[in-house]
C-alpha cells in the first residue's frame, strides 16, 4: 500500500470496496498501481415503528453500545408514494453487529434497507460506479476527504485493467495450470509435479501483477488451498460468498469472462452497481434487481423485503386481465424465397420509454416519469451507441470485438427488463407492468403487419418483436422503405435485420404441419447462414455433427432457384449426411470432434437424473479431479444403450473408442431436423417410384 506524503487529488478506477469495522476500504487503480484508501462509513437501516412511538424507540436504543446514532429521516415509503414520510434511521458502529441489531429493532416495527450488501450501500450513498472512474481527495494517511464519480464515457476500449485468466487441473499430484488471453487463446502452460509447478505459477503471478483473476470459483479455491498446503504466499481468501484477494485484486467468474470478455464484463458490472467480486457471475435478473436497489436507495425510496411490493391479483382480475403474452404469428412451414426479417430494435425497453410504463404508475396514471425509465434509458442509449458503432469499426477487429461484447452484455439486460418486471423475485415488480408492456408490443406488431399487408407484403412468420415478410419481386430497397414507414407510424425503431435469398421455416419435431417457434434456417443474399433452434445452434452439439449440419444446409441452399433447392439441393444435402455417416462407420472421425460439452449448473450430487455430463463429472470426481458448479464437462458416447449411465459415456480425454451407432443416429437426426418440411414429399416420391417399378419391372 502506498502512502501519500501530503494531501492529494487522485484520479483512478474503482476496483473494490471492503469493510473493516466502521471503515470502507477502497481499492483504486491509480496509474499502474492499486492503492488502498479508507473512508469512514457506518452501516444503517430504517425503521417505521408500529407498536411504539418514534420517541419511545429512540429512548429505548439511544444508549445502545453498538448504535452510533438514531435520527429522524424523510424517505418515500414506496416507489408510488407521492410524498416523503418521517422514519427513523439507525446507524450501527460496526458491520459485525449489524444483523443482530436489525433483528432486535425489528421487534418494534417494520425495518427497511436491510437487504443491501455493505458494498452496494456504500456505492449508492456515495453515488459511485464499480469499475468506473472517480476522483478522490486523500490526506497523508490515505483517508478520503472527498470523493466523486466521473460520468461514464462512451470509450470503446475497456479500462486499463490487467487480467490473468487461467484454469487449473490436478491429477495424481501432477498440476496443470493454463493461462489465456482475452480471446481465450492459450498463452502459457505450467505443467509438472505439484509443488514445482505451483511455485512457478505463483512467481509468474507476482511478476505479472494482474488487477483481476478470471477463473472458476473451484479453481481459485483449489489454488488457495494448494498455496496453504505448501506454505506459499496466499492469493487471498473466500469469505461470505466472495473472494477477498490479496493486494486489491478482483475476482471475475470465468464463464462470464469467456462469454463477454473484459469490455463486456465492465459494462455489465457498471450496470449492476455492485463490486465485481460479488456480481461478476450474476444473471440478468439479479443484475436488474441490483440496479433497481441502487437507484431506489440513491433516490430516497425505502427498500422493502423481497416481494413486499407485489400486489396480489384477485381471481376475477386474473381471469379478466390475464396476460396473453407476446404475439406469435404461426410460421408458414416450408421453403421461401426473397424474405426479409424486420426486427424492432430493443422493442420492449423502447415501449417502456415511449409509454412511460413503470411498476408504480400502471394503475395510478403516468403524469410523472416512472421509476424504471431513468436507468432503462441510460442502458438503452449505451447499447444502441455500441451496436451502431460496430459498423464504423469493421476494419478494426479488436475495437469491433469490444463494441460487440459491450452491446451484447447490455442486450441481455434490456431483453430481460420487461420479463423481470412481473417476476416474483422483483422487490418492486408486479404483473400489471409485465402485462401492459406485452399489450403494447402486441398492438404495435399488429400495426406493423397491417402496414406491410397494405403494401402487398405477406407475413409468413411473426414473433413478439420481429416479422418475416415476402413479396414477389421485392428488392432490399422496398423492404427498407417499408421499415421506415413502420417506424414513422409506430414511433418504434425497426430495421431489416436479414434479407434471405432462401429461408426454411421448420415444423414441430413431431412431424406435424404446425410451425415451430424460433426454428428456421436460411442463407442471405450476402451468403451468411442464419439459423435458430437446430442442432447447429446448441452448445452441447459436438463439432462433427454441427459441421455436418452446416455443410448440408449450404449444399441444399446453394442453388440458383427454388426448384433447384427442392430437387438438386435436397439431394446434395442428403449426400452430405450419408458421407458423414460413412466416415463415422469407418472410424475416420477424430474422437475430439465427437466431444460434447455442457456446463454444470450445480454440483453433480444435486442433479436428480444422471445426465451424460453429470455422469462424466461424477466419473472425474471419482478419479480425483475436483469438478463442480460452473465447470465445462466434456464427454464422448462409448456405449449409449448400456444400462449403466457410467458406461454410456466417458469423460473427454479418457476414451479410446466411440459408439459409432450413436453418432450416426445424431448425424441422421441433425439431417432430419432440417429436412422435416420436405420429408412428406420425399416419401410420396419414393412410393410413386416403387409403384412404377412394380408395374414396369
What is the meaning of each model-derived region?
Residues 3-7, 19-30, 275-355, 406, ...:
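DNA-dependent DNA polymerase catalytic subunits
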Amino acid at each position: 500500500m502506498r502512502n501519500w506524503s501530503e494531501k492529494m487529488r487522485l484520479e483512478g478506477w474503482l476496483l473494490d470496496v471492503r469493510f473493516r469495522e466502521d471503515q470502507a476500504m477502497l481499492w483504486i487503480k491509480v496509474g499502474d498501481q492499486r492503492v488502498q484508501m479508507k473512508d469512514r462509513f457506518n452501516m444503517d437501516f430504517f425503521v417505521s415503528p408500529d407498536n411504539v412511538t418514534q420517541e419511545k424507540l429512540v429512548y429505548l436504543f439511544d444508549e445502545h453500545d453498538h448504535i452510533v446514532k438514531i435520527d429522524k429521516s424523510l424517505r418515500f415509503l414506496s416507489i408510488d408514494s407521492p410524498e416523503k414520510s418521517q422514519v427513523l434511521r439507525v446507524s450501527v458502529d460496526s458491520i459485525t453487529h449489524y444483523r443482530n441489531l436489525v433483528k432486535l429493532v425489528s421487534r418494534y416495527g417494520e425495518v427497511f434497507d436491510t437487504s443491501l450488501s455493505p458494498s452496494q450501500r456504500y456505492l449508492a450513498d456515495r453515488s459511485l460506479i464499480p469499475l468506473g472512474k472517480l476522483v478522490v481527495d486523500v490526506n497523508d494517511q490515505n483517508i478520503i476527504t472527498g470523493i466523486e464519480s466521473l460520468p461514464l464515457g462512451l470509450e470503446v476500449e475497456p479500462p486499463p485493467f490487467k487480467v490473468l485468466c487461467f484454469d487449473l487441473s490436478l491429477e495424481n499430484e501432477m498440476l496443470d495450470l493454463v493461462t489465456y488471453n482475452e480471446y481465450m487463446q492459450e498463452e502459457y502452460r505450467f505443467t509438472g509435479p505439484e509443488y514445482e509447478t505451483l511455485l512457478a505459477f505463483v512467481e509468474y503471478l507476482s511478476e505479472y501483477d494482474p488487477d483481476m483473476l478470471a477463473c472458476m470459483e473451484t479453481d481459485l479455491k483449489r489454488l488457495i488451498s494448494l498455496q496453504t498446503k505448501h506454505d506459499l504466499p496466499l492469493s487471498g481468501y473466500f469469505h461470505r460468498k466472495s473472494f477477498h484477494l490479496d493486494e486489491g485484486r478482483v475476482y471475475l467468474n470465468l464463464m462470464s469472462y469467456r462469454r463477454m470478455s473484459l469490455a463486456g464484463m465492465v459494462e455489465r458490472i457498471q450496470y449492476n452497481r455492485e463490486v465485481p467480486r460479488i456480481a461478476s457471475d450474476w444473471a440478468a435478473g439479479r443484475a436488474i434487481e441490483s440496479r433497481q436497489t441502487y437507484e431506489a436507495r440513491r433516490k430516497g425510496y425505502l427498500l422493502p423485503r423481497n416481494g413486499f411490493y407485489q400486489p396480489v391479483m384477485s381471481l376475477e382480475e386474473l381471469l379478466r386481465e390475464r396476460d396473453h403474452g407476446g404475439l406469435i404469428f404461426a410460421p408458414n412451414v416450408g421453403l421461401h424465397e426473397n424474405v426479409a426479417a424486420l426486427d424492432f430494435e430493443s422493442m420492449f425497453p423502447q415501449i417502456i420509454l415511449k409509454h412511460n410504463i413503470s411498476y408504480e404508475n400502471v394503475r395510478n396514471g403516468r403524469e410523472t416519469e416512472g421509476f424504471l425509465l431513468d436507468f432503462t434509458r441510460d442502458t438503452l442509449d449505451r447499447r444502441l451507441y455500441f451496436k451502431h458503432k460496430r459498423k464504423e469499426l469493421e476494419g478494426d477487429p479488436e475495437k469491433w470485438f469490444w463494441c460487440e461484447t459491450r452491446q451484447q452484455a447490455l442486450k441481455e439486460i434490456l431483453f430481460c427488463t420487461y420479463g423481470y418486471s412481473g417476476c416474483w423475485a422483483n422487490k418492486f415488480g408486479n404483473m400489471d407492468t409485465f402485462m401492459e408492456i406485452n399489450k403494447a408490443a402486441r398492438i404495435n406488431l399488429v400495426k406493423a403487419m397491417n402496414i406491410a399487408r397494405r403494401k402487398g407484403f405477406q407475413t409468413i412468420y411473426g414473433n413478439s418483436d420481429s416479422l418475416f415478410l415476402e413479396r414477389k419481386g421485392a428488392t432490399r430497397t422496398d423492404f427498407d422503405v417499408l421499415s421506415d414507414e413502420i417506424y414513422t407510424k409506430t414511433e418504434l425503431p425497426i430495421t431489416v435485420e436479414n434479407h434471405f435469398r432462401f429461408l426454411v421455416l421448420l415444423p414441430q419435431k413431431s412431424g406435424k404441419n404446425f410451425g415451430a417457434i424460433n426454428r428456421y434456417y436460411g442463407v442471405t443474399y450476402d451468403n451468411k447462414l442464419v439459423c435458430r433452434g437446430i442442432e447447429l445452434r446448441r452448445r452441447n452439439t459436438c463439432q462433427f455433427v454441427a459441421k455436418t449440419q452446416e455443410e448440408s444446409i449450404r449444399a441444399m441452399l446453394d442453388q440458383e432457384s427454388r426448384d433447384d433447392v427442392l430437387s438438386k439441393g435436397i439431394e446434395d444435402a442428403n449426400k452430405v449426411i450419408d458421407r458423414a455417416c460413412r466416415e463415422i462407420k469407418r472410424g475416420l472421425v477424430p474422437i475430439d470432434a465427437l466431444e460434447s460439452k455442457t456446463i454444470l449448473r450445480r454440483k453433480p450430487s444435486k442433479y436428480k437424473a444422471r445426465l451424460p455430463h453429470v455422469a462424466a463429472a461424477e466419473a472425474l470426481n471419482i478419479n480425483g479431479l475436483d469438478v463442480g458448479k460452473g465447470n465445462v464437462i466434456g464427454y464422448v458416447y462409448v456405449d449409449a444403450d448400456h444400462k449403466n449411465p457410467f458406461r454410456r459415456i466417458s469423460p473427454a480425454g479418457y476414451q479410446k473408442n466411440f459408439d459409432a451407432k450413436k453418432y450416426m443416429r445424431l448425424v441422421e437426426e441433425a439431417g432430419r431436423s432440417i429436412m422435416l418440411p420436405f420429408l412428406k414429399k420425399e416419401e410420396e416420391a419414393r412410393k410413386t417410384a416403387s409403384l412404377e417399378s412394380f408395374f414396369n419391372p
